[in-house]
């Protein structure tokens, strides 16, 4: 849930609510209405009017870890889009590690690091001075070769097209962005134009001053509609008030089917062993099939389960019994993960995987501050003059919230969630490798061609009530 930090006022400064509200899933296509750009996916740099108030250019390109290793760029992919995808993956692992450090090892974690990155890129449109510099550095945007901060938005548009505008319709892909702005405020036209063209975020005026409660209900209803009722009443009473200037909302919904489904007839109750040594009952799915798999460093098992269409996969990382998942999480780097994925080979497997549903909701403010994004959240230091027409310097982000949802079952959707039938047809063939996720696992959902981490999390407690 959203805390009451939204819309607070400090030292006479007005706060902007950055609200990345997420339901697990793949992003939908970027669509822009009443835009001079007919199709952002085919547009050239000169076609997209990316002219924010301030531009940041680093003195030299900053290298990310392991960048010297050669990786093949996918066909028909702009090199800068590829670098942006890598930058997002570096941010993903760094942010995840900060978040995991703040949580108990028995807590489930789930988030969309790509969505957090995109939401703050939208905020970056209006940023200047050190606020802009920190946004570039924390989100690793400054690792993209010889490009300035304004061009990042063009590359984001192209990345979104590669990720979400696909011919494959075997998964349900829904995404929506929206800016809810105070109707008494005149917003910078360039900020509005770029937000709509690049990110599909239209501005909807609301009467924060005259009717804050109705504004809250309107935003909550919009979120509920865009997430098919999965996320409701996200913004609590009193969270929106007369001092609120802007609420930025991002929603994501995903519904995908396994390429190789688990038969419900093979699902049964088994024990799941949590990090604290306690055990609990889960519905354990089972199947025997060929999957991309590898036993990597220190006997950690890595398994890739494709969704229909093969362009999106779920990667499961299971440490050996003697090693905690927390240890693997802290050692993980984007280059290590890439190396593991490159080593996966088709293997005949016996897969035991819990059926589960996890939700996670948290403020990203503390983790981002620890990573160096400090000025944006400071009433005294924040510089966001490019958001409102008069170029005001009294805006800051009071807090930033993220909510994510993941459900895994035999179909890859909600179907047959309550059916438990006795085990049938389980093989005892000793020649087959076993992947048994009856203890905490790391979960990633990625786009294969660009190796973009779309979602990331930890299943530490999938237990049945």
Curated annotation (Swiss-Prot):
One of its GO terms (cellular component) is extracellular space. Plasma. Phosphorylated by FAM20C in the extracellular medium. Its main location: secreted. Residues 1-32 form the signal peptide. Keywords: Blood coagulation, Disulfide bond, Glycoprotein, Hemostasis, Heparin-binding, Phosphoprotein, Protease inhibitor, Secreted, Serine protease inhibitor, Signal. The modification Phosphothreonine is found at residue 64. GO terms for biological process: blood coagulation; regulation of blood coagulation. The modification Phosphoserine is found at residue 69. It is found in: Secreted, Extracellular space. Most important serine protease inhibitor in plasma that regulates the blood coagulation cascade. AT-III inhibits thrombin, matriptase-3/TMPRSS7, as well as factors IXa, Xa and XIa. Its inhibitory activity is greatly enhanced in the presence of heparin. Forms protease inhibiting heterodimer with TMPRSS7. PANTHER family: ANTITHROMBIN-III, SERINE PROTEASE INHIBITOR, SERPIN. This is Antithrombin-III. It comes from Bos taurus. The lineage of its organism: Eukaryota, Metazoa, Chordata, Craniata, Vertebrata.
């Amino acid at each position: 849930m959203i805390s009451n930090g939204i819309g607070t006022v400090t030292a006479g400064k007005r706060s902007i609510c950055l609200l990345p509200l997420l339901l697990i899933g793949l992003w939908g296509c970027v669509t822009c209405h009443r835009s001079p750009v007919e199709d952002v996916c085919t547009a050239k740099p000169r076609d997209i009017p990316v002219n924010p108030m301030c531009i940041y250019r680093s003195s030299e390109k900053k290298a990310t870890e392991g960048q010297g290793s050669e990786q093949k760029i996918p066909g028909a992919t702009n090199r800068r889009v590829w670098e942006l995808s890598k930058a997002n993956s570096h941010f993903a692992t760094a942010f995840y590690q900060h978040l995991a450090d703040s949580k108990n090892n028995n807590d489930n974690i789930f988030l969309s690091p790509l969505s957090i990155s995109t939401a703050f890129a939208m905020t970056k449109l209006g940023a200047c001075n050190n606020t802009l510099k920190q946004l570039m550095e924390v989100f690793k945007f400054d690792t993209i070769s010889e490009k300035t901060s304004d061009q990042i938005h063009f590359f984001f548009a192209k990345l979104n097209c590669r990720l979400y505008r696909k011919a494959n319709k075997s998964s349900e892909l829904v995404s929506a962005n929206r800016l809810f702005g105070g109707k008494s405020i005149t917003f910078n036209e360039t900020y509005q134009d770029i937000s709509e063209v690049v990110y599909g975020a239209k501005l909807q005026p609301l009467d924060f001053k005259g009717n804050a409660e109705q504004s809250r209900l309107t935003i909550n209803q919009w979120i509920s509609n865009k997430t098919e009722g999965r996320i409701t009443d996200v913004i609590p009473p009193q969270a929106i008030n007369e001092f609120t200037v802007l609420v930025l909302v991002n929603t994501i919904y995903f519904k995908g089917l396994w390429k190789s489904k688990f038969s419900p007839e093979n699902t049964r109750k088994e024990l799941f062993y949590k990090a604290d040594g306690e055990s609990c009952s889960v519905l354990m799915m089972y199947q025997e099939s060929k999957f991309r798999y590898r036993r990597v460093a220190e006997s950690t098992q890595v398994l890739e389960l494709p969704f229909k269409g093969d362009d999106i996969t779920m990667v499961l990382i299971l440490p050996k019994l003697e090693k905690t998942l927390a240890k693997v999480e802290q050692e993980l780097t984007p280059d290590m993960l890439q190396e593991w994925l490159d080593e996966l080979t088709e293997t005949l497997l016996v897969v035991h995987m819990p059926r589960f549903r996890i939700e996670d909701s948290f403020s990203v403010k503390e983790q981002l501050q620890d990573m160096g994004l400090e000025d944006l959240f400071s009433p005294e230091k924040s510089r966001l003059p490019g958001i409102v027409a008069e170029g005001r310097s009294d805006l800051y982000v009071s807090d930033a919230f993220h909510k994510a949802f993941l459900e895994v079952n035999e179909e890859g959707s909600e179907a047959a969630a309550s059916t438990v039938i006795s085990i049938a047809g389980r093989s005892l063939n000793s020649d087959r490798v076993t992947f048994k996720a009856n203890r905490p696992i790391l979960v990633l959902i990625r786009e294969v061609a660009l190796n973009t981490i779309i979602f990331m999390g930890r299943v530490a407690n999938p237990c049945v009530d």
